[in-house]
Amino acid sequence: MEVFVMSTSLGDEVIVMQSRSYSCGPAALATVLRNLGVNCTEAELAELAGTDESGTTMYGLIVAATSKGLRARGVKMELNDLRKNHIVFVKYGDTCHYTVIMSMDERNVTLADPALGRITVKREIFSRIFTGNVLVVERPCD
């Protein structure tokens, strides 16, 4: 994965790091929920999502997010439509991984990555590993 990492640093943002090799989904969801002001842990979300040693399904993450009172939906999305706090599913080689969009411009994508912390990736490289599968988590409309 180091091939496409331009920089890595932990900033002031809340980034929940994954505690197990297969818990990137719950950690990514915990990052988004905490940034939305929802108190949660990676372990709690992993249990709610049915995470096991093979990982977490997007459906499991939707169940976990809704159980915390938020709206969540899995969608297919184009790169240009990605926004802050979108949880994206990426694939490089045989590795599948959930990570969180922090910001994006015409050249770079900055991620809150549960395995690596805050990283910046060249947009061209990110476009090759981005699958188009996105989990959008939002507060319910009042």
Curated annotation (Swiss-Prot):
Keywords: Hydrolase, Protease, Thiol protease. GO terms for molecular function: ATP binding; cysteine-type peptidase activity. CDD domains: Peptidase_C39G. Gene3D superfamilies: Cysteine proteinases (3.90.70.10). Residues 18-137 form the Peptidase C39 domain. GO terms for cellular component: membrane. GO terms for biological process: proteolysis. Signal peptide: none annotated. The keyword Ubl conjugation does not apply. This is Uncharacterized protein MTH_1463.
